[in-house]
């Protein structure tokens, strides 16, 4: 239990630049408080102490503005920033290392019992105000943009924006961006994040240079390997 608390606090420091001390985080961070109490509420729910779990969750909603149903399954190192207006439904499943921001809804689209809320795989980020509705699956490493409305499965590593949500960056594009950032770091240049909906001619030129440098590096490595052979 103490290891879990320590891990949750560490996540706040890693993902929230405003975090300054452990005491401040414990006393004033609503996301941390909501997640910590949810761990206990979920245990109560699994022990079939449904009323007690719901009452505790209701109190947390009153104090933090974050509504997490005690039946929701949440993985390790889950981070909630700001938190106000977040709703996480009963059959929601959230993997490890996910982050969500204020105003996010993981909601259902049916009155029928059973699986009716979203599944977020590992390393998913959901931006402020986004709505993910129904028993859809958001693939590992996906990014859901602010105020997007998602009602279908999203593949691993994709970036989604708009209403209804549509994919603007696929995993291959993400791999290329990561490659550029790694090259930029090597040469001491802090590249901006790539966004297809806001093209910057200077950034595009820099991206082309970084792509070319990467290609030259690969060719040089290939030449060196050939020269080493007898």
Indicate residue ranges for each PLM-predicted region.
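Terminal amphipathic alpha-helical/low-complexity segments used for targeting or macromolecular assembly
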Residues: 1-59, 175-230
